């Protein structure tokens, strides 16, 4: 049984890699072919590796792991926030602040400041302050929420980090590796897979592809926490589409 079917991956465009000139040779084993200057990801491997990622995240969640979802590019920001929240976990979907993990003490101070400003408003302090000071506090709160709102209630440094596009999120990945935090990631054909513990070869530039993979890992968290089966699992015969179908889809898309 697979948690994501070949058909779902195809429909979401997970197979589209980058232009061949932008590839990272270390991703060669995850590439099926090249068509019209674009690398095509081997979705048979993606199906298998997505299963492994699902199991890894599910098992971590079953052991009360704190899981941080990271994706700051515009194609990933919404899905990362929505799915992490749905799973009761944490996220960073705007710029990664250097030291978010390796300088956690300082980050906690900024989070404490965010909570303090919120508390001031709730307790009515804003009502007795000058308007100019309230405006400055609101501006400070908005900035802190933008960068730290998704980890405001994170109790500790995460036990697992899920990343959309480790090529873009290199600083986040390096911080995780320095602290021994395992990294699960959607890895496109332009990325270096060496620092990724659990690789999901996938197009990380398409919103539908990011949503599909991210939602499935959120399902894994929910299943791990609840001890229940996730929404859908696919029998092997639902993946009967051959890998050649991927080539047909790519050629058709490129010719359109």
From Swiss-Prot:
Q: Which domain of life is it from?
A: Bacteria
SUPFAM superfamilies (alphabetical): Ribosomal protein S2
GO CC, one annotated term: cytosolic small ribosomal subunit
Instruction: Tell me the keywords, alphabetical order.
Output: Ribonucleoprotein, Ribosomal protein
Looking at the keywords, is Nucleotide-binding present?
no
Q: Which residues form a coiled coil?
A: none
| Gene Ontology BP terms | translation
GO molecular function ontology, one term from the record: structural constituent of ribosome
Which family is it part of?
A: Belongs to the universal ribosomal protein uS2 family.
**HAMAP family named among the record's database cross-references:** Ribosomal_uS2_B
Q: From the Swiss-Prot or TrEMBL record, give the protein name.
A: Small ribosomal subunit protein uS2
Species name: Streptococcus equi subsp. equi (strain 4047)
Recite the lineage of the species: Bacteria, Bacillati, Bacillota, Bacilli, Lactobacillales
Q: What gene is this protein a product of?
A: rpsB
């Amino acid at each position: 049984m697979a948690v994501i079917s070949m058909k779902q991956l195809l429909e979401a465009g997970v197979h589209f890699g980058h232009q061949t000139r932008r590839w990272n040779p270390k991703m060669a084993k995850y590439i099926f072919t090249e068509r019209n200057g674009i690398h095509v990801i081997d979705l048979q491997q993606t199906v298998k590796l997505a299963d492994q990622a699902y199991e890894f995240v599910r098992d971590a969640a079953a052991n009360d792991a704190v899981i941080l979802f990271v994706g700051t590019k515009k194609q990933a920001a919404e899905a990362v926030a929505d799915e992490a929240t749905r799973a009761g976990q944490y996220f960073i979907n705007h710029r990664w602040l250097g030291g978010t993990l390796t300088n956690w003490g300082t980050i906690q101070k900024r989070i404490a400041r965010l909570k303090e400003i919120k508390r001031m408003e709730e307790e009515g302090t804003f009502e007795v302050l000058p308007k100019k000071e309230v405006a400055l506090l609101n501006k400070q709160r908005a900035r802190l929420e933008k960068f730290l709102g998704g980890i405001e209630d994170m109790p500790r440094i995460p036990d697992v980090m899920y990343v959309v596009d480790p090529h873009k999120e290199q600083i986040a990945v390096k911080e995780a590796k320095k602290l021994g935090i395992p990294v699960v990631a959607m890895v496109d054909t332009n990325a270096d897979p060496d620092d990724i513990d659990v690789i999901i070869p996938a197009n990380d530039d398409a919103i539908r592809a990011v949503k599909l993979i991210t939602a499935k890992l959120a399902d894994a968290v929910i299943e791990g926490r609840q001890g229940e089966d996730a929404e859908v699992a696919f029998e092997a015969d639902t993946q009967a589409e051959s890998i050649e179908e991927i080539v047909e889809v790519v050629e058709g898309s490129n010719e359109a």
